[in-house]
Amino acid sequence: ALLNASVQDLMKLDRTEAVYEAILSRQNVPVEYLREALTGLAGLQKKDAVSLLLSMIGANDASGQTSNISSLGQLLTEQPAAALKKARNTLEDLATKGKAEETRRLGYAAIMTADGSGENALFAASQSKDSLRDWLAAVPSISNAELRGNLFSSVRSLMFELPPNLKAEASGGSLLQPGIAVDYFQPSASNVAIE
């Protein structure tokens, strides 16, 4: 019954672990309901919110269920920087070893929130172009506007030059081919005989 019930119906039920887990497993749930479910579940399981979120995100990523990772990620990046710093190693694992793009982006956003800057996360991401793409995609999801603004210079520098260990792709022969080829035929004159 909990799997098929709407979030509004779940909020009317007694607050149990199963109800809170059902709310946190849904996508497109209002943030205030997610916050309440996280706080309630953390209290019932006697865990802190960050470790609970990280275990849920890790389990969802491992099983390939990424539909609600962005919602859980929003809750994670709202957590205090001090609490996120305690889980720094787990955040780095999410950022560098996550299966889904959403998980890796969330990991980078949480690392930047924990550090209060993007320099360490940028250094970690500069190991490959895919990681760098994930880092860039994580920037808009940072909830702290001041931190997001401070990342402007780092993002801007990537517009003109890649980190030294990453080289631009060599131009291939395929880039020298014309982009479009059009064949144009004039209509036949009306006084021509078809043979």
Predicted regions and their residues:
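Long, ordered, helix-rich scaffold segments
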Residues: 1-195
